[in-house]
C-alpha cells in the first residue's frame, strides 16, 4: 500500500493501482454491490479530459508539457487495458463526482508514471488543478452521460434495429402469397396474408427507429462549461467552443453547447424521454415475440402456422420438443427494459434545485437497456426470424374451416342472414359452404364464386 493525502487526511491506496485517495475512499464506503460504473461512461469521461486539456492549452491556461502528458495518458487509457483502475460502483454520490475524480486521478498518475515521477505525488500533474481544469463533476458527468448514450444508441441499438427490420422485411416478401385467417380478440377474423401480418411487425420497428433518431436531437446538447450550478464559474472565455470542437472531432458526432446550462445540470429530461422510446420499443418487441410464439405453437396441438428453427432441445424430460427460446429471451429483455424505465423516471425526478443527484443510476439503466435490446434483437433476427418457415397445409386447413369467410357474403345476403349461417355452421359442426346450401341462400357454384379468400386480403 502507499499513503496519499486528500483534504480529509491520509488514505491507504493499493500500490499497484493508478487511482488515488478519493477513489480509495469511495471503495471503502460504497463497495457493497457488484454494479460498476459502465465502461462507456468511463471512456466518455476520459475523452472529455483529453479534449478539455487541449481546449485549456489553446486558450493559454495549460502549458504544452502538461497538455501533452494528459492527452497522451488519456489516449493510452482509451486504447484499453486499464479497467482494473476504474473499480467504482454505480451506487455512489448522485453527481458522479467520485467517478469523475477516479478518472482525474488515473490520468494524472499514469502521466506521472510514464514520465518517471512518483505515483500519488500529484507532481507534475495534479488531478484537480490540471486534469479537471475548467470543469466540475456537475457538468462533466452529465456531458459523459450524453456522449455515452449517443455513441451506444448509434453504434449498437440502431444497427440492431435496422438488422431486425430487414429480417422481418425478408419474411414480408417470402410470405406475401401465404393467405391465412387473421385474428382479432384472439378469435377468427377475415383473411389476410402472412406477409401482411409481418409487415405490421416491420413497421413497428421502423417507427421505433424514427423515434430513436428523433430522441437524439437534444442528446447532442452537452453540459460542459456549466461547472458547478450552470453559471460557468471558472470557465475561461472560449473554452466551451473549444472543448466541444474537440469532442466533435474525436467522436464524429454533432455535439453542441447546451441551450440552457441550468437545465442541463439540474434535470435529465432528455434521457428520460429517450429511455421512454426504448420502453416503447420493448413494448413493440414483446408484442412481436408473443405473436410469433403463438403462431408457431404446437406443433400438433397449437396454432402451428409457423415452423420454428430447431436451435436446441426444449425440454429435459420431453424428447423432441422445440421451444421459442429466442422469443422468451427477448420478452425477458423487454421486461427488464420496462423495469429500467421506471428507475430512469425515478432518477430523473430527483433534480433537486440546481443538480440532479441520481445521475449514475440513470445512465446505468439507460446503457443496460441499450445493450440488452441490441443483443436481444440481433439474436432474435439471426436465430429465430430468419429461420421461420410457413406451415402451408395448416393455413389452408384454417381457411377452409373459418366461419368468418361469411363476411364476403354480407354485401349479397345482408348481415342477419350471414349471422344465422355462421351460427348454424358452428352449432352443427359443418363448414360455411354446407350451411349456406342447407339454408337455401346460395348454390354451391354461387358460394364458390363469391367466397374466394385470396380476393379478400385487400391491397396493402
Swiss-Prot record:
The active site is at 185 (proton donor/acceptor), 315. It is found in: Cytoplasm. CDD domains: Fumarase_classII. InterPro entries: Fum_hydII (IPR005677), Fumarase/histidase_N (IPR024083), Fumarase_C_C (IPR018951), Fumarate_lyase_CS (IPR020557), Fumarate_lyase_fam (IPR000362), Fumarate_lyase_N (IPR022761), L-Aspartase-like (IPR008948). Signal peptide: none annotated. One of its GO terms (biological process) is tricarboxylic acid cycle. Its EC number is 4.2.1.2. GO terms for molecular function: fumarate hydratase activity. The keyword Lyase applies. It is an enzyme of class 4 (lyase). Disulfide bonds: none annotated. Substrate binds at residues 95-97, 126-129, 136-138, 184, 316, 321-323. SUPFAM superfamilies: L-aspartase-like (SSF48557). It comes from the Bacteria. Pathway: Carbohydrate metabolism; tricarboxylic acid cycle; (S)-malate from fumarate: step 1/1. Keywords: Cytoplasm, Lyase, Tricarboxylic acid cycle. It catalyses: (S)-malate = fumarate + H2O. The keyword Hydrolase does not apply. GO terms for cellular component: cytoplasm. Homotetramer. Involved in the TCA cycle. Catalyzes the stereospecific interconversion of fumarate to L-malate. Belongs to the class-II fumarase/aspartase family. Fumarase subfamily. There are 2 substrate-binding sites: the catalytic A site, and the non-catalytic B site that may play a role in the transfer of substrate or product between the active site and the solvent. Alternatively, the B site may bind allosteric effectors. This is Fumarate hydratase class II. It comes from Chlamydia caviae (strain ATCC VR-813 / DSM 19441 / 03DC25 / GPIC) (Chlamydophila caviae). The gene is fumC.
Amino acid at each position: 500500500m502507499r499513503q496519499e493525502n486528500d483534504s480529509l487526511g491520509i488514505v491507504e491506496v493499493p500500490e499497484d493501482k493508478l487511482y488515488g485517495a478519493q477513489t480509495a475512499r469511495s471503495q471503502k464506503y460504497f463497495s457493497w454491490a457488484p454494479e460498476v460504473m459502465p465502461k462507456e461512461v468511463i471512456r466518455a469521461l476520459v475523452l472529455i479530459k483529453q479534449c478539455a486539456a487541449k481546449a485549456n492549452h489553446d486558450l493559454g491556461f495549460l502549458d504544452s508539457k502538461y497538455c501533452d502528458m494528459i492527452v497522451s495518458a488519456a489516449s493510452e487509457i482509451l486504447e484499453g487495458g486499464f479497467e482494473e483502475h476504474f473499480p467504482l460502483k454505480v451506487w455512489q454520490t448522485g453527481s458522479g463526482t467520485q467517478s469523475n475524480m477516479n478518472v482525474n486521478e488515473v490520468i494524472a498518475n499514469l502521466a506521472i508514471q510514464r514520465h518517471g515521477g512518483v505515483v500519488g505525488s500529484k507532481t507534475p500533474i495534479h488531478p484537480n488543478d490540471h486534469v479537471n481544469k475548467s470543469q466540475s463533476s456537475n457538468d462533466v458527468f452529465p456531458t459523459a452521460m450524453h456522449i455515452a448514450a449517443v455513441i451506444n444508441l448509434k453504434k449498437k441499438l440502431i444497427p440492431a434495429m435496422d438488422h431486425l427490420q430487414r429480417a422481418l422485411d425478408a419474411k414480408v416478401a417470402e410470405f406475401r402469397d401465404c393467405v391465412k385467417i387473421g385474428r382479432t380478440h384472439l378469435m377468427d377474423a377475415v383473411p389476410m396474408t402472412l406477409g401482411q401480418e409481418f409487415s405490421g411487425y416491420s413497421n413497428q420497428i421502423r417507427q421505433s427507429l424514427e423515434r430513436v433518431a428523433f430522441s437524439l436531437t437534444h442528446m447532442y446538447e452537452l453540459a460542459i462549461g456549466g461547472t458547478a450550478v450552470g453559471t460557468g464559474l471558472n470557465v475561461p472565455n472560449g473554452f466551451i467552443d473549444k472543448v466541444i470542437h474537440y469532442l466533435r472531432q474525436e467522436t464524429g458526432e454533432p455535439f453542441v453547447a447546451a441551450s440552457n446550462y441550468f437545465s442541463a445540470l439540474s434535470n435529465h429530461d432528455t434521457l428520460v424521454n429517450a429511455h421512454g422510446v426504448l420502453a416503447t420499443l420493448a413494448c413493440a418487441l414483446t408484442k412481436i415475440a408473443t405473436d410469433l410464439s403463438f403462431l408457431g405453437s404446437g406443433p400438433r396441438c397449437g396454432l402451428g402456422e409457423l415452423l420454428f428453427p430447431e436451435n436446441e432441445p426444449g425440454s429435459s424430460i420431453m424428447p423432441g420438443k422445440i421451444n421459442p427460446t429466442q422469443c422468451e429471451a427477448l420478452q425477458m429483455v423487454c421486461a427488464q427494459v420496462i423495469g429500467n424505465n421506471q428507475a430512469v423516471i425515478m432518477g430523473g425526478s430527483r433534480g433537486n434545485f440546481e443538480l440532479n443527484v441520481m445521475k449514475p443510476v440513470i445512465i446505468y439503466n439507460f446503457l443496460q437497456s441499450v445493450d440488452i435490446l441490441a443483443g436481444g434483437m440481433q439474436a432474435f433476427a439471426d436465430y429465430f426470424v430468419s429461420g421461420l418457415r410457413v406451415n402451408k397445409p395448416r393455413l389452408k386447413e384454417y381457411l377452409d374451416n373459418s366461419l368468418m369467410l361469411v363476411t364476403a357474403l354480407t354485401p349479397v345476403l345482408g348481415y342477419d342472414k350471414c349471422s344465422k349461417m355462421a351460427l348454424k355452421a358452428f352449432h352443427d359442426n359443418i363448414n360455411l359452404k354446407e350451411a349456406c346450401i342447407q339454408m337455401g341462400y346460395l348454390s354451391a357454384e354461387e358460394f364458390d364464386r363469391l367466397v374466394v379468400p385470396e380476393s379478400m386480403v385487400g391491397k396493402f
